[in-house]
Every structure is written in structure tokens, then in C-alpha cells.
């Protein structure tokens, strides 16, 4: 194998990355540094430390990145009202650039000459991790075991773990039949019965949300306060970004909000079915569009909507650290200077309903928009010239005998 002295491994403590840890030690005869990120996945991360220590790891990083994740990645993404292919709120995609960033930082701190991850050769995550790594440290070596080894089934991974005395749970607690990924923004489910696109997902699959049918019969109202496009308070109580999202996840989950069952187009070329729970993100998206509806200029809002699919695609395909994403982000952030105010929402059985919005920076003028007497604020006769000028090119074409079809 290539000359590698030290590798930083993105380590969850689960079967796959525990096998990768031992495989790296044996295959590359190198020192391994483990990095475990707490992104609000709801699982205890400290057991990863004990497992890594038992496998001889001397340098172990377990970082609480929840605030950085929401403040520097989730919130900037939501300023753009970002949705991939009309539905997906990019919960997995947006977490990968932060993990890649921290992998490189640790590699620099520890003098490691390589990083490694547990993403398979079929998915998007390998691209996201590695594009980020190369953008931040061009000369870094990336080791992707799933593209090198022959352990291509869970059973082979289990056998390898037993052979090398890697602590695992072959028996005991029932394992989920789905491949799952979770952080503060969402939880995803893939595989199992979901690989048949006609088979309905099972109700007991969902972990964060109740079914809309079983949600409370009484709606709940929320008020979200925005400053420069970001939520800063919930029902008048100021909160940190991570606390905002965690609170909205809890409340939204209680009302059956944020379930999604989609087939998406992966960057590597295949279609993949996934189910997602994004209760807080679903609320945030609806509320942000509502506050923008009264604070953004029409053409700015329309331009943002035109650019959003490109921005979403850049995040989905791993180009968070690219110059084009950074350029778009500057434009998006500039549009949020006046996105301030309060949005009132009603949550009811899976629905997020906007019931009010107000802002000192509002462009809504009731005197002009009213259906009642406006006192001369708007001269309706002006509309005639406006319409004629906008119709001019079509009138010319018709006068020239141009056929429409």
C-alpha cells in the first residue's frame, strides 16, 4: 500500500467504521486518529471513545458541532429557501461539508497525511466528503475502503469484526432494517422494503414524528422572529440556532410535520428512494418564505427563486466549498439585510399554515393594495399605458401577420 503514516478517520463507532479502523491499521500499518462529530443525531457519542481506545487509538476527537452546524451551514442554506428536486431539504448533504472541514483541521493539527471515511462507492457522500477535502487541502490523500476492499456485505463485515475481536452486537437489540442517517436537521431512511418503490413505508419506521392522523386535534400556534433572514427567537424567547432547530423538531414532530417519501436522482447516476423526517426544517422553510413575502423586492425574490435550484444542486452534489457556491451565498446573504420581523404559524395534523407576518421593513402598503377607497394612493388609469407598452411587441407581431402557432 502507499506510504501512509497517520490517517484521520470519520468514526461513528458503528460496525462499518469500526471495521474500517482495524482495516486501516492492518492494511496501511499506520496510526489512526478517530473523529466523531456530534451533529445532534440523538445518539450517545461517548461510546465511540471507549471503542476506539479498545482498538488502540491514541488520539480521539469527539466534537460537539451542533451550534456550528446550524449557524454556519443550515441557516445559510435556509436563507435561500433551498430544496433539491422540489422536495428534499438536504439534511444529509449539508452535514458533509462540516465533517470534511473538521477532518482536514484535525489532519493539520495531528500531522496526518490522509483522511478516511465510511461512505460507499454507490452513494453521494463519497463525493461530498472528498470534494470538500480537496478544496480545503489539495494534497491530502483520501482512503475510501469501500472502493478498495472485498467486504461487500454486512455478513462479511460481521465476520471480519469477529475474526479481529472488534466489539460488535451480532445479537441482542434488534437492528433497524433501514440504513439511517441523522443530525439536527433530519433523519433519513433507505434500503429494506423502501427499495421497492411501490411498497408503502411502515409506520413504525418513523422516529421523530407522529402520524398526522394521530397528531393532536387542537392546533398549536408559533411565532418566529427573524433577523437578517435567520430565526433568533421562538414565541418571543431568544434562542441559539441549534436550540431553535431542536425545539422546532420537537414541536413539529408532535404535530406530524415533515415526513417525506421521495425518489431522488443521485449525483453518481442512479435513482434512490429515501424517506425523511425534517419537522423543524419544514417549519423553517414555510416561515422564511412568509417573512420574505413582505420584505423582499419582487425582482429580488424572483431572482432568488431562479437561482435556488442551482444552489441546491451545488449542495447536494458536494460543492459547498466551491467558488460558485460561495459567490451565490454572498448574493443570498445580501438579500437578507431587510428580512426582519415575525411570522405566526398554525401547526395542525401535518400542516404548517401561515396565519400572519409583520415587519418594520415590510414593503406591503395596505393603502395601495386595498380593495376599498385608497384616497388617490394608486391611480388606476396608469394601468392602461402600462398594459399597452407591455403588449407592444405582441401587437406588432400580430399586425405583421405572425402566427402564434
Curated annotation (Swiss-Prot):
Name of the molecule in the record: Argininosuccinate synthase
Lineage, top ranks: Bacteria, Pseudomonadati, Pseudomonadota, Gammaproteobacteria, Pseudomonadales
Residues the entry annotates as binding L-citrulline: 88, 93, 124, 128, 179, 188, 264, 276
Residues that bind ATP: 10-18, 37, 118
Pfam families: Arginosuc_syn_C, Arginosuc_synth
Catalytic activity: L-citrulline + L-aspartate + ATP = 2-(N(omega)-L-arginino)succinate + AMP + diphosphate + H(+)
GO biological process: argininosuccinate metabolic process; L-arginine biosynthetic process; urea cycle
NCBIfam families from the UniProt entry: argG, PRK00509.1
Localisation per UniProt entry: Cytoplasm
Keyword annotations: Amino-acid biosynthesis, Arginine biosynthesis, ATP-binding, Cytoplasm, Ligase, Nucleotide-binding
InterPro entries recorded: Arginosuc_syn_C, Arginosuc_syn_N, Arginosuc_synth, Arginosuc_synth_CS, Arginosuc_synth_type_1_subfam, AS_cat/multimer_dom_body, Rossmann-like_a/b/a_fold
Species whose genome carries this gene: Pseudomonas fluorescens (strain Pf0-1)
